[in-house]
Structure formats: structure tokens, C-alpha cells
A protein has these predicted regions:
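Acidic/histidine-enriched, glycine/proline-rich intrinsically disordered or flexible terminal extensions
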Residues: 145-175
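Short beta-strand segments enriched in hydrophobic/aromatic residues
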Residues: 33, 45, 100-102, 138-141
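Short, low-complexity N-terminal intrinsically disordered segments enriched in polar/charged residues
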Residues: 1-31, 35, 39-43, 47
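Hydrophobic/basic alpha-helical segments enriched in Actinobacteria
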Residues: 21-22, 39-40, 59, 87, ...
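A solvent-exposed, acidic/Ser-Thr-rich amphipathic alpha-helical stretch
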Residues: 38-104
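Outer-membrane beta-barrel transmembrane domain signature
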Residues: 114-116
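Extracellular/periplasmic carbohydrate-active domains that bind, remodel
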Residues: 9, 99-109, 118, 145-147, ...
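Short beta-strand edge/turn micro-motifs at domain boundaries
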Residues: 2, 95, 118-152
Length: 175
């Protein structure tokens, strides 16, 4: 393995930087959903981007607002990015397939229910003004599961910093 500071040949270096910028966009989207931060979610998209999320097809801006509203019913959510295949097609265009798993915790029938979503995002990206972002996303459903939660893990969870679904949650600002 070459040293971390070894220079890659021109095009390979540009592709590696582009792929990392695209991955960061995917992470901003997920973090924004989990923190109910539409602005952070929207930063993953370019102006005028579109999104087909099955239950909603339209502008990315409208999707982000809708997601924040709809996710308020959950006690907590966690959107996880898994495999992220990216193909850089030229200096300003790329496509990607992002595997994702989402955990959604909600109150149900006097207890708590964990809903789990497995899916993929099929993305088209563009680089505009030296910024890579999504211009079109299709959300593909693979499968889902819903199950009642039993007792919590036998750990002293109250001793940990507790997460929240907003900008005030521990770790949001690095503190």
C-alpha cells in the first residue's frame, strides 16, 4: 500500500477526490434526516435537483421538508450508508448506487416498535462550481421489517451522552 501522502496520477487523483466529495454528500443527507435538519439534507443536492422516493416524487427541497415533517413522529432514527459504488463519467458527471439501512423507533400499542428499511439510492451527480452533489435520486425499496422491542440492553445507558433528533443532540457540533 502506498504511503497516505503519495500522489496519484492526475486523473486518478481527481476521481478519488470526486468520489470522496460524493460520499460526503451521502453522509450529510443521512445526518440531516436523523437530526431533522432540512438544510443539511438539502446540502447533499444541487439547486433544482429532483428525488423519487416512491411516496413522493418532486424537488429535493420539497422532499427534505416533507421528510423532516414525517420523521417527527419517531423517537429516533438512524440512516446508515453501506456500500457506495461511484462511477465518475467525466469531469462533472457521475452516477452512484448507495446501499442503505434505516432504523426508525416509534411508540406503538403501549410499547416501542422498531421499523427497519433496507434499500438503495440510485443517484446522478454533477460537479458545479467545484462542488459535487446529487442532481437526481431514485429510492429503491428492497425490504422492510417491523418488530416490537423488548427490554433494553443490560447496560447503564444513562451514563452515556444521549442523542436527540435535532441540532442539539450530543455530537452534532462535535462536543
Amino acid at each position: 500500500m502506498p504511503p497516505a501522502d503519495a500522489a496519484l496520477p492526475g486523473a486518478a487523483a481527481a476521481d478519488a477526490l470526486a468520489a470522496e466529495a460524493i460520499r460526503q454528500a451521502a453522509l450529510r443527507y443521512c445526518r440531516g434526516v436523523d437530526r431533522l435538519d432540512a438544510g443539511l439534507m438539502l446540502s447533499a443536492y444541487h439547486d433544482g435537483a429532483t428525488d423519487d422516493h416512491g411516496v413522493f416524487t418532486g424537488s429535493a427541497a420539497d422532499l427534505c421538508a416533507r421528510v423532516v415533517r414525517s420523521h417527527r413522529r419517531y423517537e429516533a432514527t438512524m440512516h446508515c450508508v453501506l456500500n457506495h459504488a461511484i462511477e465518475i463519467t467525466d469531469d462533472s458527471h457521475a452516477t452512484g448506487e448507495v446501499y442503505n439501512v434505516t432504523y426508525l423507533l416509534r411508540a406503538a400499542d403501549g410499547g416501542r416498535q422498531l421499523d427497519t428499511w433496507w434499500g438503495r439510492y440510485l443517484d446522478r451527480y454533477e460537479c458545479r462550481d467545484e462542488r459535487w452533489a446529487i442532481v437526481h435520486r431514485v429510492c429503491v425499496h428492497e425490504w422492510t421489517r417491523s418488530e416490537p422491542l423488548g427490554a433494553a440492553m443490560p447496560i447503564e445507558a444513562q451514563l452515556f451522552r444521549q442523542g436527540r433528533e435535532d441540532r442539539g443532540g450530543s455530537g452534532y457540533d462535535g462536543k
